[in-house]
Amino acid sequence: MEVKTLANIKSAIKRAELNVKANEKNSAQKSAMRTAIKAFEANPSEELFRAASSSIDKAESKGLIHKNKASRDKARLAAKLG
């Protein structure tokens, strides 16, 4: 993998490559979370609520979102469920 970086030291180049990979994984996980939330909001159902809640929990456990944001998001979704 070729990463555009100013780093000259081998370990710094490797860290830059790993940072790009981590950013792609994290972005994909957050995007999946947002997609699950939007799917639930478009058609509130118990099944979609569980999927959205699960994706929020996964993002929280990976450190992508703060635990308070996860709780707030799940509470708002639960309120929409009724």
From Swiss-Prot:
Can you name the source organism? Streptococcus pyogenes serotype M4 (strain MGAS10750)
BP GO terms, sorted: translation
The answer to whether the entry has keyword Plastid is: no
- Give the family, as the similarity comment puts it: Belongs to the bacterial ribosomal protein bS20 family.
Molecular function (GO) terms for this protein are: small ribosomal subunit rRNA binding; structural constituent of ribosome
- By its UniProt entry, which Pfam families does this protein fall under? Ribosomal_S20p (PF01649)
What keywords are assigned to this protein?
Ribonucleoprotein, Ribosomal protein, RNA-binding, rRNA-binding
Q: What does this protein do?
A: Binds directly to 16S ribosomal RNA.
According to its record, what are the GO cellular component terms?
cytosol; small ribosomal subunit
Checking InterPro entries in the record gives: Ribosomal_bS20 (IPR002583), Ribosomal_bS20_sf (IPR036510)
Q: What is this protein called?
A: Small ribosomal subunit protein bS20
